Regions:
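Generic structural signal for small/hydrophobic residues in well-ordered secondary structure
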Residues: 85, 111, 145, 222, ...
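N-terminal glycine-rich phosphate/pyrophosphate-binding loop and immediately adjacent elements
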Residues: 70-199
Length: 527
């Protein structure tokens, strides 16, 4: 899950799955045409070019082709466009195989949406502008961090024992026990849809139920399957949870977004998927990964150079940049968000096939924002709360970002998505902080008095190098083009979280796709 809040829901669904008998005879692990885990493993071997170690679950970088003894490194001209985690990882893995690529980044700062805020808060506390949490199952980024000599902090173990999330709807607290009880009525249709849909739904492979669910919005699914529909407390909770999880109103999102996350939790599926727990952060900030990758790629990175056009030139590619320069490359890795590619780059002469162009021009991009506020104390602990909350009072959701950080102060992130983010966009952090505190006070009594006055705001939809937070599928998009995002076009490769089937929207998706792109390039050059 992209947010801690879906983790809480998944935990409750798992408890329900253990309590509710299997009345329809469907087995969670009987997913057709293939289980998610078998898909991940197959994709890792055949598409991403990585293998999963049976001992550690880590990406095996030795799966990348090595140069043969006495063989010279390839002389192909390789351009990687995008200096975020995906592009830098691809260049780093290629360099480990003796293949040198040049990375072109439009910004003067590397890292893209992996970016740590070290300047706003007192006491040396930090927050993440962008991607924040790393699952235990995110093997590619965990291995990369380890290789680079970085330490991962376990933020879950830093939570006080017995602390719980807070849910607040219709003017009243909505306890985890109540949520769990209400979920029991939803479990059977959720499980049935997951099994009948199969995983994954792609433009090349799908089931009848998968296509039907893809053509249905999350809001409609809630209205059809939750007692009381989207106006019930559980309906409101699911609506808010998925609005922030993907950064879009639930009326816009494919129901498969909900089915594949929550339907995968429960009897049988815990084995298949492993835990999803947002357990880790990089000690000192996630962008230390970026800094160390950049240091390892000294002399291979060009910043302040924005791509404006991609043209197929025989077997090569011509890239046009905003400084009016052009380069010709034998192989290209486009590690840019599709939101930027469609708005900032001319592809009229690229020769990209129709399905690829459909994915580039239509793929959803989340509208998420982060408002981070520092407090004198971690007041939420005194309320028996972990910092995680959902509410209908207007602020949507929170979590604590200072778990495993020293000091008595604490930072809460107010995380928003969809129309709430649109209403915040362009406003000053101090005004947003006052608005948040007024809306959060009924949920966290006494919180306002603890605010230090410090706040920062990350408005990703207005960030011109991202134009949003991370990718998601709108209604109907799984069957229209899912899977095409990562497909090569000749000697042009694609990387970024938006190209990752299993880790779309995660830092892991960026790293995993960079490994895959490096594999594709090295296989083509070395064999």
């Amino acid at each position: 899950m992209r947010t801690p809040l879906l983790r809480q829901l998944a935990t409750l669904v798992r408890r329900v799955a253990a309590d509710v008998p299997d009345t329809d005879g469907a087995r969670n692990d009987a997913v057709d045409p293939m289980s998610r885990r078998s898909f991940v493993t197959t994709a890792a071997v055949t598409a991403a070019g990585v293998s999963l170690s049976s001992c550690t679950g880590a990406t095996d970088i030795t799966a990348l082709p090595d140069l043969r003894a006495g063989e010279s490194p390839p002389t192909a001209r390789i351009a990687i466009v995008g200096g975020g985690l995906a592009g830098l990882t691809a260049a780093y893995r290629l360099k480990q195989r003796g293949i040198i690529a040049t990375v072109y980044e439009a910004n003067t700062r590397l890292g893209g949406r992996c970016w740590t805020n070290r300047s706003s808060f007192a006491g040396g506390q930090i927050a993440e502008h962008g991607g924040e949490l790393i699952d235990q199952s995110h093997s590619s980024i965990r291995q990369l961090a380890q290789e680079l000599g970085l330490t991962l902090d376990n933020v879950l173990s830093a939570e006080p024992n017995g602390s719980e999330p807070l849910y607040h709807f219709d003017g009243l607290a909505y306890s985890a026990a109540q949520v769990q009880q209400d979920l029991k009525a939803v479990w059977q249709p959720l499980k049935r849809d997951y099994v009948e849909a199969g995983y994954p739904t792609l433009y090349t492979s799908s089931t009848a139920r998968g296509r039907a669910l893809d053509a249905t919005s999350i809001r409609t699914w809630i209205d059809q399957n939750v007692p009381g529909g989207s106006s019930s407390k559980l309906g409101q909770l699911l609506d808010v949870a998925y609005c922030i999880e993907y950064g879009a109103e639930t009326t816009e999102q494919s129901a498969l977004n909900l089915i594949y996350l929550l339907g995968a939790v429960g009897q049988g599926q815990v084995r298949l998927f492993g835990p999803s727990n947002e357990k880790y952060k990089v000690r000192g900030g996630n962008d230390l990964i970026v800094q160390r990758l950049a240091a390892a790629l000294n002399g291979q990175i060009v910043t302040g150079k924005a791509l404006q056009g991609v043209s197929a030139t025989g077997d090569a590619w011509t890239l046009a940049f905003d400084d009016r320069s052009r380069i010709v490359a034998d192989r290209v890795v486009l590690a840019l968000p599709f939101s930027v590619l469609r708005e900032r780059v001319s592809l009229s002469n690229s020769g990209f096939p129709a399905t690829k162009m459909r994915a580039i021009t239509e793929l959803g991009m989340g509208q998420n924002a982060k408002l981070a506020l520092q407090f004198r104390t971690r007041h939420w602990y005194t309320l028996g709360n972990s910092g995680d909350s959902f509410a209908d009072t207007g602020y949507q959701a929170t979590w604590e970002v200072t778990r495993a950080q020293p000091g008595t102060r604490g930072i809460l992130v107010n995380y928003t998505g969809g129309s709430v983010t649109s209403q915040q966009s362009g406003r000053h952090p101090s005004a947003l902080a006052q608005e948040f505190l007024a809306r959060a006070e009924p949920v966290f009594p006494g919180l306002t008095a603890e605010h230090t006055g410090v706040a920062s705001f990350d408005d990703w939809p207005r960030n011109q190098r991202a134009l949003g937070s991370y990718a998601f599928y709108r209604v109907g998009q799984y069957q229209r083009f899912a899977g095409a995002e990562r497909e090569m076009v000749g000697s042009c490769h694609f990387a970024g979280e938006h190209t990752s089937q299993d880790s779309q929207g995660y830092l892991e998706g960026a790293v995993e796709s960079g490994v895959r792109a490096a594999r594709e390039v090295s296989t083509a050059l070395v064999g």
